[in-house]
């Protein structure tokens, strides 16, 4: 079929579906109407195609309209409306139903789906917003509120607007993008990797990682027919799919109740339903009022409450990136995600496949709105594998999360009385099949998860914990059958065919005894046995709950559908409510038993006596005397730093979200250079300690602030610290030794954090093991010894997950069936104060470096040193670690930190002491002289490269003798290994042993070796010139300059200073913005984007907008979100901005687009809607701690006090610069001061930054723009994520010492302006 014949082609499918194609050429017309031939990328031009799967609802069975007369839908109207949406998203581009690429000329590549894969993640992310815009365009200004469900028999009732005459609206089931590339030159398939994400046109859409399917077209006139695959077959749905998952149940105690009441600090508690450990502590709610669906809903009115903070984690060999967060949604009730952890283990034979796998996880976590705070990359040597186990053909991952419950753990344990309860399905019942040849089975939508988390959090906060009867807690299996059983508890489910997904009922025949077996098989294969990324929520039926549920889920763009109602009989009953044509006599229902695993829980105790066999016996060839070819010490040491496991992780850390939630007190970057070497992370659960009881806060009622309300310091805050440990190079050979080393690494890393006692630490164990004969006994014995090891160390132990790397009962799994053994320890503990922590950057000159190993032995087996030496077989044996000594060592480190005897510290692991000291010197920008103790026997390289777990501490010279004396009194093994130097231009790294010099080189050379792998990975990013952008301008010590002395004001919210905070679809709850507004004294009101017209009244003085980059293409997401907000509230934002007594503040590219489209008055010669945010030159998401200069002449009222100041601030996003139709327009904004803030160099004398990454876009370094009168301000740097000083990764030198974050002054100046302009 050629392109012209598709102009009116609406291919009808089952259920009245049709796939409609649209084309967007990205070139200007050349001579004769032909595309111009350019020098870009093999002289390519690109045409973006859209394949839209519409459901016109004219036929079909089992849909929501079954049994009713369906209104006719005009496909032409839907097509024209969708083209209007594309013109809004892509202004200035031609949009049509016909391809403009020439037929029969040149050669083509296309990324069109061929049926082996499914639509990319971006396709699923934008479909809900496009559906909302489609409804608005077709219905015009008609406001229609349809009820979520309408089953009067179950207490649902009829909602407003039900039964009214409405315009029929087709449903957008999926939107798929494809590129067609045309060239006069010959292009081949192997160019696809280079071309996929390197298209320069602004209409080009960023790919989802793994979406590389460019193929040549045989006939240039043939356009690809997109095939939409939705749940074609069940995957991994066998009831015995993961028989090892039950093992953690053996190591949990279920006889302890959850403690309640008011306590100071936190208390370690145990969940009575699943035995997991957590910390009961005070949590903070930034706002208690939410305006949704034309009504203000309030919770208990208290800014804080008690909840449980806990951690989950799991190792996956084939599941999607965010599978853990779906399956663990109800572990301690419903929990918010405070921080994410990411670890990847793979082979070094194909680094680009490993990078592709890693990028998919980075994108999914970034789009979820939760910061990624910890992680690791373990690159294995494929030539050295344990006996009986081949090298892993594909990488596997560890995903962890720190969560905070907002309700107590719940399960439906008794029948429901009154109006009953209903089960709702959150998310899209969608399963993407594995792409042929792909690196992983599926890719999750982070945006969809963000909408689910934000919607449920808001619903529970507003409706109350009693509104939720139960949450899905399906830990062992992810099938819909298991999730329904978990959501229903002791009760059953009654549902109807009209409530099930179309895919589940499209092939059902009429219900009759003869068809019962076939229908049951269809429902099992297409629904009950399908693993779909959805969450089930059981809600008590009340009119208020239904109203809140409908409004909240529409606000956050979360798809929700009624799945059924609770019934007394514990079974699933499906009623056929289709048209009478399907009635053939007999019962019109089918019954299914509730899900019961085919294996008993808990497992039999006999497995505890099973023998345990180490995988690698201590005999030849693993104890071979051949130590490998000799190598120069210098090359070996630098080679260790170049190893992917040890080397710099900038290619990961600088391209994930690290702070958007505003609750992060420690992320991966530390020191003045923001180097990714942190040993632990920390999230804050109570960002403000509140005023002392003896002081009266100010309420902003008087012009002058009382003197006793001025404070020049910030209070300590409480939170939760986390640390990871893994030794997957050793674990496959010696599981017990590898597990103990991983536990030791996590505990010692956490000892550097500001925790109070080692007894507060809880270690979570995650395990993957091949399900072979005797596996249960081996795993049980291993976990028993790990738990005993933790008890000896004085820490608690949680076994969170145990997964089979090869599943039984279903043949080889899609991920290849590799026999993988993997182990990760994740330690966490409550901290009463986020200050007084030890970070790996050296702080002082002439300090002493002490090395405290966890064992006197030297570990070399499977070390990075042996891998660098090129040994084909690992030699030696693992080091033996005592649990009791580990606990004693951790307590000693805590004592040295508490007494201020140590000022910095770093854990010793991969790469040994040498790698740890090199990272400390680079992070602190200091010279370092390392002294190998002369009294040690053997090769000094063995001491420097030993990977025995331990800690390296920096102790001031004045405190060195006291520290050493204390360690000796506690019988702690301690080595004095070095002395720090000064910060000089030529920093040196020197290693000696007596008179022998082992290494002497400049630190620049050391840093170059350490960054080499990261630079290599950055080169293969989505930009041709990526290799030309280095980190040089970023890795300079920054200085600040203040125009005033920073302070904070002890205040309480003033109800007359009310600010509306916009809630946007697909975005997480704006915690950072609400925290900053409430702490600074504003009365913050969270407002749905559907209800702005009812909120922006005279009682509201300000509007705050904060969005996140929640899709793989920020430009598309920003344009769609802005179009949706303004179409739902026509003229509302423009009228609010035009009032003289209001202000607005926007943070991020999405907020800029919304306010710009609201006609923010910028300049008579430049309309705000003509200003656009431009992408970073890296074409990647950037997370940077950058210097920002406040224009001395800016009229911005928010920057009145900060004018002329140079301050560091977080800047995150893909679009971190501004563009205009002509460069002169922005130049005039800079001259007039409307360029309120600018990206700057390392100090004031450096001037505006012009090079990446200090200026991410390498254009005019404008970071903020204000209106002519200064009332409205949009920023690309996040002042809410820098509002507290504990959010700063490093406090720079300044002309005025910084003890309070100066960014608080932005909100204080806005208060002063509101007071001066109030009526």
Swiss-Prot record:
It comes from Equine herpesvirus 2 (strain 86/87) (EHV-2). The keyword Metal-binding does not apply. Keywords: Virion, Virion tegument. GO terms for cellular component: viral tegument. SUPFAM superfamilies: Class I glutamine amidotransferase-like (SSF52317), PurM C-terminal domain-like (SSF56042), PurM N-terminal domain-like (SSF55326). Its main location: virion. It comes from the Viruses. This is Probable membrane antigen 3. It is found in: Virion tegument. InterPro entries: Class_I_gatase-like, FGAR-AT_PurM_N-like, PurM-like_C_dom, PurM-like_C_sf, PurM-like_N_sf, Tegument_herpes_virus_N. GO terms for molecular function: phosphoribosylformylglycinamidine synthase activity. It holds the Pfam family GATase_5. GO terms for biological process: purine nucleotide biosynthetic process.
């Amino acid at each position: 079929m050629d392109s012209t014949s598709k102009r009116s082609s609406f291919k009808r499918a089952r259920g009245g579906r049709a796939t409609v194609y649209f084309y967007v050429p990205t070139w200007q017309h050349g001579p004769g109407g032909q595309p111009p031939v350019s020098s870009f990328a093999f002289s390519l031009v690109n045409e973006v195609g859209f394949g839209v799967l519409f459901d016109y609802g004219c036929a079909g069975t089992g849909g929501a309209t079954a049994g009713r007369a369906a209104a006719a839908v005009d496909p032409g109207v839907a097509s024209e409306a969708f083209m209007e949406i594309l013109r809004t998203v892509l202004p200035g581009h031609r949009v049509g139903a016909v391809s403009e690429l020439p037929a029969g000329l040149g050669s083509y590549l296309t990324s069109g789906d061929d049926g082996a894969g499914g639509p990319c993640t971006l396709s699923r992310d934008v479909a809900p917003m496009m559906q909302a815009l489609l409804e608005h365009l077709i219905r015009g200004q008609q406001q229609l509120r349809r009820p979520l469900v309408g089953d009067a028999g179950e207490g649902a009732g009829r909602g407003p607007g039900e039964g009214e005459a409405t315009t029929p609206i087709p449903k957008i089931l999926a939107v798929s993008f494809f590129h067609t590339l045309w060239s006069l030159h010959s292009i081949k398939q192997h160019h696809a990797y280079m071309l996929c994400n390197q298209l320069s046109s602004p209409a080009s859409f960023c790919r989802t990682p793994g979406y590389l399917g460019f193929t040549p077209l045989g006939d240039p006139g043939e356009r690809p027919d997109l095939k939409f695959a939705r749940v074609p077959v069940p995957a991994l749905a066998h009831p015995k799919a993961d028989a090892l998952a039950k093992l953690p149940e053996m190591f949990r105690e279920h006889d302890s109740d959850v403690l309640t009441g008011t306590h100071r600090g936190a208390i370690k508690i145990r969940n009575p339903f699943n035995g997991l450990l957590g910390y009961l502590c005070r949590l903070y709610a930034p706002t208690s009022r939410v305006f949704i669906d034309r009504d203000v809903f309030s919770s208990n009115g208290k800014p804080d409450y008690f909840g449980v903070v806990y951690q989950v984690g799991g190792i996956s060999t084939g599941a999607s990136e965010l599978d853990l967060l779906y399956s663990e949604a109800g572990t301690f009730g419903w929990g918010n995600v405070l921080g994410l952890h990411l670890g990847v283990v793979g082979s070094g034979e194909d680094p680009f496949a490993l990078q592709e796998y890693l990028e998919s996880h980075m994108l999914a976590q970034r789009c979820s709105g939760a910061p990624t705070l910890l992680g690791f990359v373990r690159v294995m040597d494929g030539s050295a594998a344990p006996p009986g186990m081949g090298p892993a053909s594909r990488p596997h991952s560890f995903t962890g999360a720190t969560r905070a419950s907002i309700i107590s753990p719940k399960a439906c344990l008794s029948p429901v009385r009154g109006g009953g309860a209903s089960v709702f399905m959150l998310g899209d019942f969608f399963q993407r099949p594995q792409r042929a040849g792909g690196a992983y089975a599926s890719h999750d939508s982070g945006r969809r998860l963000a909408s689910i988390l934000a919607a449920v959090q808001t619903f529970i906060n507003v409706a109350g914990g009693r509104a939720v009867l139960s949450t899905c807690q399906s830990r062992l299996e992810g099938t819909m059958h298991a999730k329904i059983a978990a959501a229903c508890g002791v009760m059953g489910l009654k549902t109807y065919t009209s409530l099930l997904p179309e895919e589940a009922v499209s092939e059902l025949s009429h219900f009759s005894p003869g068809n019962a077996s076939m229908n049951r098989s269809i429902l099992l294969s297409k629904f009950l046995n399908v693993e779909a990324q959805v969450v089930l929520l059981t809600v008590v039926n009340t009119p208020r709950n239904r109203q809140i549920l409908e409004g909240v889920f529409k606000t956050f763009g979360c798809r929700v559908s009624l799945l059924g109602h609770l019934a007394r009989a514990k079974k699933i009953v499906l009623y056929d409510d289709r048209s009478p044509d399907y009635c053939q006599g007999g019962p019109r229902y089918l019954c299914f038993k509730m899900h019961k695993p085919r294996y008993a829980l808990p497992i039999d105790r006999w497995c505890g006596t099973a023998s345990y066999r180490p995988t690698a016996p201590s005999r030849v060839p693993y104890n071979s005397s051949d130590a490998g070819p000799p190598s120069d010490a210098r090359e070996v040491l630098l080679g260790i730093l170049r190893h992917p496991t040890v080397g710099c992780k900038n290619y990961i850390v600088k391209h994930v979200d690290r702070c958007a939630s505003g609750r992060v007190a420690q992320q991966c970057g530390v020191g003045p250079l923001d180097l990714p070497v942190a040993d632990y992370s920390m999230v804050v659960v109570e960002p403000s300690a509140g005023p002392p009881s003896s002081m009266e806060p100010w309420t902003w009622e008087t012009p002058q602030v009382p003197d006793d309300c001025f404070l020049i310091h910030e209070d300590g805050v409480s939170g939760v610290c986390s640390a990871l440990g893994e030794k997957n190079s050793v674990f496959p050979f010696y599981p017990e030794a590898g597990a103990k080393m991983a536990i030791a690494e996590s505990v010692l890393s956490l000892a550097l954090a500001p925790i109070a006692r080692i007894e507060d630490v809880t270690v979570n164990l995650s395990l993957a093991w091949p399900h072979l004969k005797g596996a249960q006994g081996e795993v049980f014995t291993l976990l028993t010894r790990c738990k005993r090891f933790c008890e000896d160390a004085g820490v608690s132990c949680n076994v969170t997950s145990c997964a089979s790397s090869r599943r039984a009962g279903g043949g080889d799994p899609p991920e290849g069936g590799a026999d993988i053994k993997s182990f990760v320890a994740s330690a966490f503990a409550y901290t009463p104060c986020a200050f007084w922590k030890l970070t790996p950057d050296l702080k002082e000159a002439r300090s002493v470096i002490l090395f405290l190993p966890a064992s006197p032995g030297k570990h070399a087996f499977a070390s990075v040193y042996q891998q660098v030496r090129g040994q084909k077989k690992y030699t030696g044996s693992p080091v033996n670690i005592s649990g009791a000594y580990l606990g004693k060592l951790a307590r000693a480190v805590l004592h040295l930190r508490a007494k201020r005897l140590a000022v910095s510290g770093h854990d010793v692991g991969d790469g040994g002491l040498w790698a740890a000291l090199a990272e400390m010197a680079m992070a602190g920008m200091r010279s370092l002289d390392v002294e190998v103790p002369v009294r040690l026997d053997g090769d000094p390289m063995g001491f420097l490269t030993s990977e025995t777990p331990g800690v390296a501490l920096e102790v001031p010279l004045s405190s060195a003798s006291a520290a050493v004396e204390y360690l000796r009194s506690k019988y702690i093994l301690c080595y004095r290994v070095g002395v720090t130097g000064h910060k000089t231009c030529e920093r040196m790294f020197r290693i000696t042993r007596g008179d022998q010099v082992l290494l002497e080189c400049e630190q620049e050379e050391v840093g170059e070796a350490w960054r080499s792998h990261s630079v290599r990975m950055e080169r293969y990013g989505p930009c041709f010139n990526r290799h030309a952008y280095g980190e040089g301008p970023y890795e300079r010590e920054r200085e600040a300059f203040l125009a005033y002395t920073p302070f904070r004001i002890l205040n309480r919210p003033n109800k007359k200073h009310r600010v509306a905070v916009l809630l946007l679809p697909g975005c997480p709850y704006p915690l950072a913005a609400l925290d900053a507004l409430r702490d600074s004294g504003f009365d913050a009101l969270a407002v749905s984007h559907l209800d702005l017209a009812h909120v922006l009244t005279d009682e509201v003085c300000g509007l705050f907008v904060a969005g996140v980059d929640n899709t793989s293409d920020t430009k598309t997401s920003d344009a769609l979100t802005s179009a949706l907000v303004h179409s739902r509230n026509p003229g509302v934002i423009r009228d609010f901005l035009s009032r003289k007594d209001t202000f607005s503040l926007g943070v991020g590219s999405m907020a800029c687009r919304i306010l710009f489209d609201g006609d923010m008055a910028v300049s008579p010669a430049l309309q705000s809607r003509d200003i656009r945010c431009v992408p970073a030159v890296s074409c990647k998401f950037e997370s940077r701690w950058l210097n920002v200069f406040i224009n001395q002449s800016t009229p911005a009222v928010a920057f009145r006090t900060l004018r002329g100041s140079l301050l560091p601030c977080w800047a995150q996003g893909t679009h971190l610069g501004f563009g205009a139709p002509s460069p002169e327009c922005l130049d005039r904004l800079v001259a007039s001061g409307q360029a309120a803030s600018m990206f700057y160099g390392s100090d004031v004398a450096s001037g505006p930054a012009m090079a990446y990454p200090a200026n991410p876009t390498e254009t005019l370094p404008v970071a903020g723009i204000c209106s002519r009168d200064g009332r409205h301000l949009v920023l690309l740097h996040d002042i809410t994520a820098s509002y507290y000083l504990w959010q700063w990764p490093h406090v720079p030198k300044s002309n005025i010492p910084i003890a309070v974050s100066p960014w608080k002054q932005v909100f204080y100046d806005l208060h002063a302006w509101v007071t001066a302009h109030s009526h």
